Amino acid sequence: MVFVACGLNHKTAPIHVREKVALQPAMQDSLLSSLLDLPEVNEAAILSTCNRTEIYCDTNTPEVLGNWLAHEHQLSEELLSQFLYIHQGKEGIKHTLRVASGLDSMMIGEPQILGQMKQAYQHACRLGTVKTQLRPVFEYIFRASKRIRTRSGIGANPVSIAYAAVQLIGQLFKNYHSLSVFLIGSGETASLVAKYLHQHGVHRFLIASRTLENAQKLAETFGGKTLSIGDIPQYLPLADVVISATACPLPFINKSLVEHALEQRNHAPMFLLDLAVPRDIEGNVNELEQVHLYNVDDLQSMIEKGMDERRNAALQAEQLIESELDNYIRWHRSLRAKDVICDYRNQMHTLAQQELQRALKKISAGQNQQDVLNEFSMRLVNKLTHNPTIGLRQIAWDNREDLLDLARYLFDTTANQSLYEEIS
């Protein structure tokens, strides 16, 4: 197996490129199936968030992944290759560990990425695109990333892009309590935004979602009025803050819609935060007076502030990554001995059972127990050592001192340096 991590993220690609390869939930099954149709790909999972799209797979031909990604999203291979990275083998494991631990996130140490990776893995398992090769790799990565976060402290007081969004609102509005917030979207990011805003004192929510049931759940938890996406034009003028985080493929809030809302508000300021990739709000909305529009890329400068403690924790986490990587390599190598160990143990167990049953029959027949046990012990030792003894004699005859040293190591013995004197 060759583990490969291939993709692009907020460090390598701007938002207008990332949104073109973002994986829509409705596309997930078909894309995974399409990926597994490639004869070069044995198993695969796809992770897609607002900041990254990554393919994790078992393949000996990683170059096909970029070609496939470009073809599926109708992009030029030459264009996409400028932003794409491919990590193989040990480097692929290291990259994935860094992603799962939050070290590669825009907000260093944010915990959501681990949950998102687990969801991508679980979905691939259900679909059957992750099987015996990738399953133990992912399970190791999940265990290791949890240890890294705990030991480094990088996961202490967890933050996320959603939390950064709330902090940005706090910089522009001094009083959370008086705000009317229009939340569009009911996914994980939207839920986190609602949670943090509610904790800061916001109680006036308008919540719209393509799935009305999901919006109702948020409204029940944090209070507020439940709306459909079609209600946005009517209720947009009531919002001081608009936070949109849907999975729509195209923008649905345009300049004219916001301009109309401003007129209804007598041009009172509006704060719009587009956390979606692809974007929900057209960029030219920012041309309007009294409108403050931000997207996920705009959060980067804010995220950099006040991160000293997390960066210190990240240094420790990087050291732990190297340690976990060494552990993984040793663990992965040990898998090669798994079948040998299993077969050897089964063989020894079978021999022991055969001799035990023979001894029990003799005892049942009235033979002296001490004599039977002595014979049982001798016969068992002879049978267990028969094949190794033949092998040791052969390698001694072949003058393979290296194999004899290995045998001494395996049998934990400090016997003579050679079983037989060299015949000159």
Swiss-Prot record:
GO molecular function terms listed in the Swiss-Prot or TrEMBL record? glutamyl-tRNA reductase activity; NADP binding
Entry function: Catalyzes the NADPH-dependent reduction of glutamyl-tRNA(Glu) to glutamate 1-semialdehyde (GSA).
Give the catalytic activity.
Answer: (S)-4-amino-5-oxopentanoate + tRNA(Glu) + NADP(+) = L-glutamyl-tRNA(Glu) + NADPH + H(+)
Where in the chain is the site Important for activity? H95
Per the UniProt entry, the Enzyme Commission number(s) are 1.2.1.70
Q: Which UniProt keywords apply?
A: NADP, Oxidoreductase, Porphyrin biosynthesis
**Record GO biological process:** protoporphyrinogen IX biosynthetic process from glutamate
Q: Does the keyword Ligase apply?
A: no
Name of the gene: hemA
- Listed name of the protein: Glutamyl-tRNA reductase
| Binding residues for NADP(+) | G185, S186, G187, E188, T189, A190
Know anything about its domains from the record?
A: Possesses an unusual extended V-shaped dimeric structure with each monomer consisting of three distinct domains arranged along a curved 'spinal' alpha-helix. The N-terminal catalytic domain specifically recognizes the glutamate moiety of the substrate. The second domain is the NADPH-binding domain, and the third C-terminal domain is responsible for dimerization.
Q: How does it assemble?
A: Homodimer.
